[in-house]
Amino acid sequence: MTGCGKTDAENITRTEEYHYDMFGEHVYVFSPEDNPQEIQEVLDELWQKQETNQFGEERYSVYFLPGEYDDSISAKVGYYMQVAGLGYLPDDTRIPSLNCDARWLGDDSNHNATCNFWRGVENLTIESNTMWAVSQATFMRRVHVEGALYLHDNYGWASGGFLADSLIDLATDSGSQQQWLSRNCDWKAWIGDNWNMVFAGIEDGKAPIGTWPAKQYTTVDVVEEMREKPFLVFDEEKGFGVFVPNTQRNSKGVSWYKAGACVQRQELDGVFLPISEFYVAKAETDNEETLNEALQDGKNIFFTPGVYELKKELRVENPETILLGTGLATLRAIDGNQCIHVTTPEKVTISGLLLDAGTVESQLLLQLGEKTETKKEPQAGGDASLLADLFFRVGGALSEPAKVDACVEINSNHVIGDNFWVWRADHGEQVGWNLNTARNGLLVNGDDVTIYALMVEHFQEYQTIWRGENGKVIMYQSETPYDVPKQSDYMSHDGKVNGYASYKVDENVEIHEIWGFGIYSYNRDAVVEIHSAVELPWKEGIRAHHVCAVMITGNPGISYVINELGEHCYTGGARAIIKEYE
């Protein structure tokens, strides 16, 4: 094969199968000098493997070294695939075409994308119109589309989604998407609305105009604080490394595109960490012992694609540690343990990972910070911890029922969440009310926690419980459980109230604010009342903007939107709203 040799940096060798030994056989790295026919053969083979591989164990990353690629190359992104450029800037790496369609669920004309989960694209330029027909647990970030972006496949069902730090030269068309979060983006125009379209930090004049609820647009003018997700780069002088963007405050628009042009590399606000500062993990050879040893030695971890079965938690004790996954690297708890336990409160980054419950019940999959009466405060003026592109799963993939009490517990103060899907499986293997059991999705006990694009679904009690002060959520999507057998199995407040709210803020909280919420019911198996979709304290510092409840289909229903405010949803397609709560 052509283009396979030693790089100018580090004198490291790429194999004829487009792999580097340091990253293993599930990471492909292409160069503009490679034979385009051979590149396309690899891309086609990966799509053939992964298009329908919803609960498979295979994971892949496809990286493109900086440069412009042959016009014949077209990438399609299937399950557990990540496609990315290796430049510092998206325009450093240019590929002709990238798409994700939704044709695999059947031959009918619906083009159903509601199961197009677990995939991502970042840090490159696509030189044509792009179809990105996806749902939850996906990401498109730091991308330049030199055409239009379609978030649907011919208006088939879709339930996304997340777009961040991206430039779209023409229109972005949401089509049939139920909901979507766009953060720090720019485009020529936005087309489409459905139940809950949320925009944060969009370039001036580019967020769509419309009055909610006639148009389902919720706009948050600026992003108060954000650390963009770190990403793998190849530097011609330094070799492979990870670029770590610095914190931006009160930001609007795309971080790498200013005044109508791409910024220069030297203008980027961040630091390059050489790959030598990372332990490069491989699922075939690494386990909790080798990974914890690396963490104790002060290393960051770069998880290459694969499924890592852990008998003990990975313990993060050092400030500023980075855990970065690629190719939807998956950490699976197999002995009732957590996957990750973070004890330091200072500027930890965890991103690009799928955390999977095992068949022995765990209390948690991720614990950020210690749950104590007096939490250690982060340094004044310091950077937040970042949790980005993090996905959690209970059931669906294993031959025995998966179990957990709750997936995520955030005890630390000053945390940014950026794109979560926390999912108790409603389909797949060993799925049912008494099989894949899980009480809660997300528990927040820390103060000053802000989450963008929080999606939590199908848990057996509250989906989300928030006890910390000054919490903020910008875009929330949630479906209550489909499989409640009967009302008596689904009672809150010590059995006195029918059903569980999806989102509950503790009555002792004084300050909390939310924007763009959509909570949906599909009581498939029984008539089940959910008294209210959201429970909030009635206090001056508690505010909610644009909250809707929808009964998709099935049995009724949702009685109120917030507490005992709003209309009921007792028939298929019924939608009730609260415009403002304060």
Model-predicted regions and their roles:
Residues 1-3:
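C-terminal segment of classical bacterial N-terminal signal peptides
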